[in-house]
Amino acid sequence: RSRMLTRLPNAGTSDHERELRTSWEENASAVSRDPKLIRQIFALLQEVEGAPADMEQPSAFNLAPARKALAVELPAPASDRLPRVRMVLAASGATECTLHGVPLNGPVMECLKGLNQVGARRRWEEDGRILCQGGEPVSGYNKSILDKVVHVGDDPFNLYLMLFQMVTRPARLKIIGESGLKFVDLAPIRHFLPLLGARLTSVVPGQEGLPARLESSAMLPSDVAVPAELPADALEALLVATAGWERDVTVDLSGHAEGRNIVSKVLPILQSAGIKASLTDTEDTLSLHVVPGKAQFSDELLPGINVVAAATLLAMPAFVGGSVKLSGRWEATGDARSGDAVKGLFSKLGVNLSVADGELSASFGEGIAEGEPLPSPNPVDDLTGLPSALLPLGLALSLIPAVRAKGGVMPKLPESVDKVLVESFLNQLGLSCEDGRLVSIEPSTTPWASPTVQWALALSLAAFLRPNIKLSNPGIVTNYLPVYWNIYNTLPT
């Protein structure tokens, strides 16, 4: 493709791109009958540039942490999701406030810039402050937004936050993002949005992800039933957006597997912002009733703790022994259900987790004489109760006995988990799942491309068990947690 384009006059024009795509689809259909796969491969090739044959190829990131007992003391990693949710709530009602201690990573900056594109007034300072300066509300029936192009970066949560904010106002806009969002599956969103008086269509025929066009009437219902296939991040963004609706709304979460996990995070945030919200949770019903309003925040808004990153650091002693201490309050995660899930998981494993005032600490294998082997944690045979964001961590921890014994029982996983992804993760550790049993195989030497930051963090823990695992996209972690690899490479202290 690259060679053809360089030989063509006016190289790169849309006509030539169309000719290439049409030719590709005609010829590729001879080897595959899956039109979706053919289009996805072509979209991937769009990202590839011709390179000289002698050009040095980038090497994968070698994961080889020190396998010694840990003695780590650090501040707890700050959350980037809670500040983004607060930025959106403040923008929804044009609330003036200052967020303190915010990690200025890629997703936070992309969210800030995206909100500014639709009328918010946000600016950031190098010390981690984000100043929400009022301006015009970005939600509401009287705030139409027409013929606008909005860039949302590379994070799906930012995309969903923006989508559901724009659904609250008459809108006709184009949403674009980085390459990672070209392949996000927006089909569940497209099927759901008509219930909210909106429509999302793909700009590229047959491509599921961005770029996409959103049209919204802002004619919002008073009752919404959430479908089971709606992504968990999209559900969270929807609940956040209800604060800016024009009428009271009841969101029925009964049919969604992650409903309780998500509402346990969002409800306290809405209530702390002065939004009237009440939960109905019975055996047959799970629903959230929200009375829209303008968010009001206290003066000192701290970012809270990133529960997945904190749990990853606290899990390290289970692999090599020692202790990890993080300064911070566990309640500051703003996610009580995930916090309880971490406590329950560590308790099953036999990892000592202490949540004292102002400090989180985890230890394992203390008291073992020098030279004695570290025992394996207790086996965990069921991971179905874990929130989806914690599943990769739970899997890595549960595999410790099987890796050391070169086999064992595969823990039970949620039905929705990507089984191909799980199998490729197992292969990196020299395991394969056959009829519910873990069997030993030759470890894969192919560099692993992680689909999410959570899976990349889990792989970094797996390297304690099998050093020199190769991660082809370490930037997926750096984008969210810029200092993680520095910490990782300086262990055991």
Give, region by region, the residue ranges found by the protein language model.
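Short, structured segments at the rim of ligand-binding sites
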Residues: R1-T493
